[in-house]
C-alpha cells in the first residue's frame, strides 16, 4: 500500500458523512467517527464544495468503522446509499456536465447510451478526484475498473469493499437509462489482493430475432 495521500472533493466526503448520519443518527455517527480515529469531523463536516481536500484515508477509515460497528451487511447498505448520494451530489453541482452527458447519450441503443454515460462519468471522476478509473466491456458486461480506490485504501479484506462505488454506479446507470436498474457486482478488489478493483454491470439481454 502507498503512503501517498490522495483526495476526494469535499462535497463527496460530506455526502458519505451525511448519508451515514441519516442511517444511524447523529450520536451514533459521532461514536463512529471516534472509532475511526476522526474526532475532528464530529459536528465539523467538510464544506459543500469541490475542492480536493477529503483524504482517501478518511473515506477508508469511515468505511472500516462501519464494518467494525455494524458488521458487513449493514456496512454494505450504508456504503451503497452513500455512493448514490455522491452521484446525486455530483449531478446537482454540475448541471452542465449532466446536460452534456445527456446530449451525448441522446442517440443510439440503450447499450450504447450506457457505455457513453459510463465513459463520460469515468472521465469526470478522474478530473475532479484523485480516484482513477477506466471503462472496459465484453459481450455480457461493462467493467468499471478502479486503479486507485479510496474505499479500500490501506485496507485488507477477504470480501469486496467497494460498495460505495456500487452505489455510485447504480445511480449513474439508472440515470443514464431512464430509471432502469442493472445488476452490478464487484468481482475484484484491491483489498483482497487484486491488482485493480473491478465492478461489472450486466448488459441487457439481446432479444432473439
PLM regions: where:
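N-terminal low-complexity or simple alpha-helical regulatory segments
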Residues: 2-78, 86
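Short terminal or interdomain "cap/linker" segment that borders an active site or interface and mediates
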Residues: 2-11, 15, 125-166, 174-209
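Generic solvent-exposed, charged/amphipathic alpha-helical segments
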Residues: 17, 21, 118, 122, ...
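Weak global preference for isoleucine
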Residues: 23-24, 42, 62, 114-116, ...
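Amphipathic, positively biased hydrophobic alpha-helical segments used for protein targeting
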Residues: 36, 48, 82, 90, ...
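Short, mixed-charge aromatic SLiMs
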Residues: 38-45, 86-91, 188-200
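Amphipathic interaction/junction segments at domain boundaries or subunit interfaces
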Residues: 51-164, 188
Amino acid at each position: 500500500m502507498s503512503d501517498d495521500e490522495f483526495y476526494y472533493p469535499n462535497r463527496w466526503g460530506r455526502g458519505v458523512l451525511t448519508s451515514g448520519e441519516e442511517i444511524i443518527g447523529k450520536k451514533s455517527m459521532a461514536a463512529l467517527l471516534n472509532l475511526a480515529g476522526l474526532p475532528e469531523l464530529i459536528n465539523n463536516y467538510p464544506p459543500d464544495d469541490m475542492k480536493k481536500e477529503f483524504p482517501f484515508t478518511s473515506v477508508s477509515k469511515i468505511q472500516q468503522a462501519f464494518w467494525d460497528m455494524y458488521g458487513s451487511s449493514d456496512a454494505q447498505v450504508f456504503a451503497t446509499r452513500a455512493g448514490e448520494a455522491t452521484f446525486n451530489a455530483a449531478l446537482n453541482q454540475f448541471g452542465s456536465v449532466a446536460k452534456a452527458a445527456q446530449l451525448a447519450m441522446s442517440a443510439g441503443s440503450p447499450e450504447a447510451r450506457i457505455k457513453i454515460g459510463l465513459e463520460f462519468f469515468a472521465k469526470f471522476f478522474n478530473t475532479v478526484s484523485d480516484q482513477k478509473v477506466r471503462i472496459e466491456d465484453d459481450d455480457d458486461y461493462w467493467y468499471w475498473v478502479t486503479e486507485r480506490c479510496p474505499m479500500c485504501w490501506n485496507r485488507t479484506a477477504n470480501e469486496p469493499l467497494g460498495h460505495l462505488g456500487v452505489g455510485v454506479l447504480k445511480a449513474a446507470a439508472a440515470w443514464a437509462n431512464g430509471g432502469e436498474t442493472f445488476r452490478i457486482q464487484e468481482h475484484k478488489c484491491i483489498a483482497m489482493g487484486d491488482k485493480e478493483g473491478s465492478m461489472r454491470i450486466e448488459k441487457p439481454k439481446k432479444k432473439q430475432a
